[in-house]
Amino acid sequence: NYLEKVIKDYKFELSENNIQDFLSIKNNNFSKFSISKVSDYEKNPYLFFVKRILGVKEETKVELDSLLMGRFFHAVMSDDRVVNFIVRSGSKIDIDIISDEDIVSRFNIRQVVNEVIYNNTSSDIVDVLNIISMLNTHDYILQNMINRLTIAIAVEIKYYAITKFTPTFLEKKFSLEIHNDVIRCRELESNKVVEKSLSKKYDIPSINFVGFIDRVDVLEKNISVIDYKSSKTDFSLESLELGFISQILTYSLACEMLFNKKSEDILGIFYREIAKLGKTIKDYRLRGLGNSDLILQSEFSEATSEVMFLRTTKKGTAIHGADVTKAYTSNELDTLVEKNLHNVLTLLEEIYNFDFSLEKYEIENNEYYAEKQTLFNYASGTDTRLTPKVKVEYKGKELRQKILGK
């Protein structure tokens, strides 16, 4: 059992020769980073060592896991037939008159979903259909997925009817090249190289930071960035303060460079929970960070709470006091993006130190207990996240002011 040998013999120290040998062989692949790769390190450095250095892969089964389901959902929602249906339907309704329930019943959403699912060559859809056909409960599973997609499309019809932001760029890849004190990215439309100078030089080699942005919606010169999630997810000021990576703030930086935009052009960066049964359309409003400058100037400022978990005052002239940690001015968003970028590059510095000890985390004093538990949890597919020793002293509005330097 090689895992037992890893636990018993590995002393959590890598010699300089071993590190250099590893980099000489693996550097092309190792120097390509993503949000998930950095997240492995921040939540548990030993997990990063096992998964990203030793290359021990997770056990996989032929089953409908959350990854496959997520790809299936993305493929259906990004199909041109679905996007066009959302825009056509959203253009026909008066949101002040029609109820959420009427949106589902008024439009033949299921017909569009069936057409896209059964007339599609996308491997993300075909693979799921093939697995479903092998399961005894395949009809129930498929009908459940169709029902969920029906709700998800109804959510987007309401969103479009209110905001008029159109899903335009779907599942777009980005690559940020970091070399010395400069970040480079090719603009999507012109293919020109866009550069951004770092505030300081970090002790890391040249790397590429890559990823996919699920969805970018467009209204005139403004964009809104949306990332689909299988469960309820929101932005955390506490995580940002602890030095962790924020997915949506990383996407904000990527979009600024990929589309040659400024923060003043971005309505917000949000998470959209993939619809489940038993909830209402309102449960799937956007969560994340809104640009208060654009929201308060928009035609839907009074109806903001209908499309996102962010409230404005009655006349839509200010952000509700209880929600000020969810909305920021363009300049304040710049500060958050810079803070997140510093977090990312600092984590990369730690990774390239090749020190995967767990001294910064709350762990048992027993020798290698946390490392053993990490292996067991990793093998069983359960959560491997550790709790940092450092705690955030401030909360809510006070933490907001601290991070923004106010």
Language model features with spans:
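RecB-family 4Fe-4S metal-dependent nuclease core
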Residues: 2-406
